[in-house]
A protein has these predicted regions:
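ATP-dependent adenylation/nucleotidyltransferase module used to activate substrates
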Residues: 1-165, 176, 185-186
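AMP-forming adenylation/ATP pyrophosphatase catalytic core
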Residues: 20, 132-367
């Protein structure tokens, strides 16, 4: 357990989503002697998104659950309205990346621009030393170098280090993740013993502002645009069918294409300007080299020589052996030992050495 070390109780802002994980994180920090304040970020207006107030992240129901847990713990609780910034930095970027042909990861952007930026600044302005979340990952300081390290959570099935790779040294110094050494079953057991209302609440799975998964419909509703139909092409550029708008398809997709070509085909490429989608056999999806930008290094100040690593190009992918090479400021080139299926521009590629996150970036190209 993370224990408070001095006589004055250090302040801890608990990012409370209304779920069981952040609730137990709050309880653990309180038990360790921290002066806790619960905060829920209001990120969307449900009526603006055309969604029910009970089916999105940080919804009215989530706020009610978080408030009830805070009341049970007898800690202060507030709701902070970040809807304007969330719209600009998360939703509008999400749409922009899709329209450019990529596949965005808004949860990573939310951690970067909202949770570990806005909340840290709010905590500092209110005299609090730490921001606490319910992520399954660990933060430790390297005694030899003094650098803060991000490590995998001990519960391999719940490890969330992938979505935290862009935390800076300054942020890591003020972040506490008390669930990093626990398993999910232990967390639920604690919540049940404390009689928390959300002890058996299901984990959120979808993009918070697109809970039904139909991101193309959301984009059309949000922007007022209509994404027109276009041509499916084979690898030779021959038309093989008609699609419903290139933004509706992701690299590696097989289901929902509506093509009868005698053998399974997958989305292999998209040309957003021409509004075409190229399809082909699964073997056309594999690439060995990934280029990344917007790179953030954690365990090292910068990459100066090639390093052996393992890497993930998707959230819960099994790590794959690779070598990472410097490729200019804020960039790297990653060469996998074996070709990887559908590494996709817009997604994060995160590098590991053992259980330590070396760093990561955003995929911009593959070959």
């Amino acid at each position: 357990m993370i224990e408070a070390q001095n006589t004055k109780r250090p302040g801890a802002l608990i990012a409370m989503s209304g779920g069981v994980d952040s609730s137990v994180a709050a309880w653990l920090m309180q038990q360790a002697g921290y002066d806790c304040t619960g905060i829920t970020m209001r990120l969307t207006r449900n009526e603006t998104l055309g969604q029910s107030g009970f089916h999105t992240c940080c919804s009215e129901k989530d706020i009610e659950d978080a408030a009830e847990v805070a009341f049970a713990m007898d800690i202060p609780y507030e709701v902070l309205d970040f809807t304007a910034d969330f719209r600009e930095k998360i939703i509008e970027k999400f749409i922009r990346v899709y329209e450019m042909g990529g596949t965005p990861n808004p949860c990573i952007d939310c951690n970067r621009y909202m949770k570990f930026d806005h909340l840290l600044r709010w905590a500092e302005s209110h005299g609090m030393e730490y921001v606490v979340t319910g992520h399954y990952a660990r933060v430790e300081q390297d005694e030899a170098t003094g650098r803060w390290l991000l490590k995998k959570g001990l519960d391999e099935g719940k490890d969330q280090s992938y979505v935290l790779y862009n935390l800076t040294q300054e942020q890591l110094a003020h972040v506490r993740l008390p669930l990093g050494t626990l398993h999910k079953a232990e967390v639920r057991e604690i919540a049940e013993k404390q009689h928390f209302i959300n002890a058996r609440k299901h984990d959120s799975q979808d993009i918070c502002f697109v809970p039904d998964g139909d991101y193309a419909r959301f984009m059309e509703d949000f922007t007022g645009k209509h994404y027109p139909a276009g041509d499916f092409l084979d690898k030779n550029g021959k038309k093989v069918g008609t699609h419903n708008g290139a933004v509706r398809y992701t690299i590696g997709q097989r289901k929902g294409l509506g093509l009868a070509m005698g053998a399974p085909v997958y989305v292999c490429a998209k040309d957003m300007q021409a509004n075409t989608v190229t399809v082909g056999p699964e073997e056309n999806l594999f690439d060995r080299i990934v280029y990344a930008d917007e790179v953030n290094w954690i365990a090292i100040p910068e990459l100066t020589t090639p390093l052996r690593v393992t890497a993930r190009t998707r959230y819960h992918q099994t790590e794959q052996a690779a070598t990472v090479y410097p490729a200019g400021e804020g960039q790297f080139r990653l060469e996998f030992d074996q070709p990887q299926r559908a590494p996709t521009p817009g997604q994060a590629v995160v590098l590991y050495q053992g259980d330590v996150v070396l760093g990561g970036g955003t995929i911009v190209a593959v070959e």
